[in-house]
């Protein structure tokens, strides 16, 4: 049942969201930026191409770099595949929560075997800041300068 609700939610138009930013119009009145504006569609109907404006929007939202034509082609193929999934009839299909739903899983008790091993675990990281792992956002790599900074746990 929840799969139908989720599919309806995912099929909502892209322009349904509203923004909290505001702009002043020529008369000096403030108008919400998201009201009355439409977000660009991912792929225009009947076309398999993604506009440069949408690519820039996705790069900003997802912190992913679509700098090459190959990356844009991969995005267009992924969108085409997702469009094929919309054609699948899932009426009457129970949602699957786990591939092991028909089996009884025996869980072990949650006991701490070894404590105070944070320093040992943080040694596995390339870069640590204030006892936290640092990872690059998306496929944008950390600057080379960051890798040269000594971590606080290395001695």
UniProtKB/Swiss-Prot annotation:
Top-rank lineage group of the source organism: Eukaryota
Catalytic reaction equation(s): L-glutamyl-tRNA(Gln) + L-glutamine + ATP + H2O = L-glutaminyl-tRNA(Gln) + L-glutamate + ADP + phosphate + H(+)
Keywords: ATP-binding, Ligase, Mitochondrion, Nucleotide-binding, Protein biosynthesis, Transit peptide
GO molecular function: ATP binding; glutaminyl-tRNA synthase (glutamine-hydrolyzing) activity
Function: Allows the formation of correctly charged Gln-tRNA(Gln) through the transamidation of misacylated Glu-tRNA(Gln) in the mitochondria. The reaction takes place in the presence of glutamine and ATP through an activated gamma-phospho-Glu-tRNA(Gln).
Subunit record text: Subunit of the heterotrimeric GatCAB amidotransferase (AdT) complex, composed of A (QRSL1), B (GATB) and C (GATC) subunits.
Protein name (database record): Glutamyl-tRNA(Gln) amidotransferase subunit C, mitochondrial
Annotated organism of origin: Mus musculus
């Amino acid at each position: 049942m929840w799969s139908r609700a989720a599919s309806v939610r995912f099929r909502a138009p892209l322009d349904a969201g509203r923004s909290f930013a505001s702009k002043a119009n020529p008369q000096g009145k403030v108008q919400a930026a998201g009201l009355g504006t439409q977000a660009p569609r991912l792929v225009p109907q009947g076309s398999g191409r993604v506009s440069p404006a949408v690519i820039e929007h996705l790069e900003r939202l997802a912190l992913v770099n679509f700098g090459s034509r190959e990356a844009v082609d991969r995005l267009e193929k992924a969108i085409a595949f997702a469009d094929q999934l919309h054609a699948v009839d899932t009426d009457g299909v129970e949602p699957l929560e786990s591939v092991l739903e028909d089996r009884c899983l025996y869980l072990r008790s949650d006991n701490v075997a070894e404590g105070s091993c944070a320093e040992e675990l943080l040694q596995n990281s390339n870069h640590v800041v204030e006892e936290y792992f640092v990872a690059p956002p998306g496929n944008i790599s950390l600057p080379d300068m960051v890798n040269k900074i000594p971590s606080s746990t290395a001695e």
